[in-house]
Amino acid sequence: EHAPLVLAQRCSGVPAQTPLFTSLLNYRYSKPKVAAAHIADGIELLDGHERTSYPLSVTVDDHERDFTIVAKVCERIGPQRVCELMELALEQLTRALSANPGGELAELDVLPAAERAQVLHGWNETGRAYARDACLHQLFEAQVSRTPEAAAVICGDETLSYTDLDARANRLAHYLRGQGVGPDTRVGLALGRGVEMMTGLLAILKAGGAYVPLDPGYASERLRAILDDSRPAIVLADAAGRTALDALAGAPPIADLHADASRWSALPSTPPRVEGLTPRHLAYVIYTSGSTGQPKGVMVEHASVVNLWRALDEAIYRTHPSARRVSLNASIAFDSLVKQWVQLLSGRTLVVVPEPVRFDGRRLLDAIGRDRIDVFDCTPSQLALIEGARGPEDEAYPQVTLVGGEAIGEGMWSELASVSSRTYYNVYGPTECTVDATLARITAEHAPHIGGPLANVRAYVLNERLSPAPVGVRGELYIGGAGVARGYLNRPELTRERFIDDPFVAGGRLYRTGDLARWRTDGSLEYLGRNDFQVKIRGFRIELGEIEAQ
């Protein structure tokens, strides 16, 4: 019994304008032709072609002694390219049948040499010089000497100059050194956004340690899990942080940056000396959601953050030299905060966004305008609140908006692309690759995409065998280069699973993102979702396994 596909589609409920499927392979046995078909006197059928309404269809006719292959490809897919790929695949197949008839089809390399070179090397020619031998706090100290009286941090009515911030951080760093903090020593940071947070963060780096963000608003179970895994030598806290940690039995020693300030207020205001500290030591350990129910700590080194700073400077800030005021908007536990505070290394001013207004579009816009914030960094969810509240009087600020942490839908992309008075960038990157790995300016010429790799970053779209996927073909996105983290703290097996040797660069490492993507013909990447059950909420990665384990 046979039924036409039109009937099948009608019964399926799929709208008539939507293809029932987008590609069709039809293999059929056809008896060898013995004579031209006779239709009527004086008419002879020489040849014929079937037509389908599907974007891609391939018909294989088996004539016993030979085959006929006919491909029909709609124009927007690229008929010439599809036929070239088919020709190469058939060529490789015939060679394999002769040389290795027992081999697997998946081992065939169907990528043309020129295209292979493009996706592996051409679109990854991102090498740039940067300060490979400097630690973050050293670059900050160099900036202090250049702009000592410039505003470093503004928080409400309080403004702290570069000199004052440096002196405060140095005194606290001397105290931390006295508590045994040195290279790769982990120090908790349980503070809200503000002057104290930046003082504590810089002090930890100056003492040689790595900061471990602890959001005071986290559930006690999550705080306990992070503390048990990271085992910080000491925790720097404000009142809210201390309250959250005091509720936990067996918490590490706590230094309250308000109540305990007398312990270090008389210590030297010059940087402490830390022997053996290099850019390959840890700058921070940030915890992300874990599929087993336990959060996992991502270890990031100074050198990776220094490269992020330089890459963003090249990709964004040099294009907008007047953008001097940068929002300090993210939670301390969100790695997006890193690309915000590193702007201190360039002499910019960090403006703290008050917590009560962060998710009130109208009040947030008022704060951005009042504080003259030039660069705002947020998730699409937060941006939707801002744009929904924006009126004609709100056109000036911010000049530049960095949007990341979640995928941008087509509607928002089109809306942002239509704005001429402000510039929007879509940034993409997992915590394991130091915040941002790719970047795209949002313009009307393109549909939503995540752009290409930043300076000293490599991006590959690979199949299950770690072979590069052709342009336009979906695969898993792998990230290599200067941003790849050291690995997961206390998780050697997971580190080996997710951080692998780079098969294309000797001595390199790749991070398996779990994100699905494909290359576009212009060298940009299109994000296609996940290959697992991870989701993002307001920019935070959530493993459903962690929720199930509660």
Over which residues does each language-model region extend?
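Generic structural signal for small/hydrophobic residues in well-ordered secondary structure
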Residues: 1, 25, 58, 83, ...
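Conserved AMP-binding/adenylation subdomain of ANL enzymes
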Residues: 296-325, 335-374
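AMP-dependent adenylate-forming
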Residues: 174, 220, 234-275, 305, ...
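Conserved coil-to-alpha-helix start sites within the AMP-binding
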Residues: 191-202, 217-221, 329-346, 358-363, ...
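Adenylate-forming
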Residues: 1-84, 91-99, 109-110, 122-126, ...
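Gly/Ser/Thr-rich phosphate-binding loop
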Residues: 341, 345-348, 373-377, 387-449, ...
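Conserved adenylation A10 loop of the ANL superfamily
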Residues: 285-298, 431
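AMP-binding/adenylate-forming domain of the ANL superfamily
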Residues: 47-68, 84, 88-91, 99-286, ...
